């Protein structure tokens, strides 16, 4: 993981420091910049 210090894995997924608005979770990922879009295990949804 040292090769990618901007990526940090958490208990639920991982976050990318370079893109703080993106956070991966156990079920997919969410983009805080675009809260209406959230990726899930099955694909993605657009609120």
UniProtKB/Swiss-Prot annotation:
Tree of life domain: Eukaryota
Predominant place of localization: membrane
Record-marked site positions (Not methylated): 14, 29, 44
Keyword Transferase among UniProt keywords: no
Transmembrane portions of the chain: none
Lipid anchor positions (S-farnesyl cysteine): 14, 29, 44
Cell membrane recorded as keyword: yes
A GO CC term assigned to this protein in UniProt: plasma membrane
UniProt keyword annotations, A-Z: Cell membrane, Lipoprotein, Membrane, Pheromone, Prenylation
Subcellular location: Cell membrane
Topology in membrane: Lipid-anchor
Propeptide residue intervals: 1-3, 15-18, 30-33, 45-47
Entry GO MF terms: pheromone activity
The protein's role, per its UniProt record: Rhodotorucin-A is a mating pheromone in cells of mating type A of Rhodosporidium toruloides.
Protein name (Swiss-Prot/TrEMBL): Rhodotorucin-A peptides type 3
């Amino acid at each position: 993981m040292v090769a990618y210090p901007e990526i940090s894995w958490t208990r639920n997924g991982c976050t990318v420091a370079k893109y703080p608005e993106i956070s991966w979770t156990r079920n997919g990922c969410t983009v805080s910049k675009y809260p209406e879009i959230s990726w899930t295990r099955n694909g993605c949804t657009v609120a």
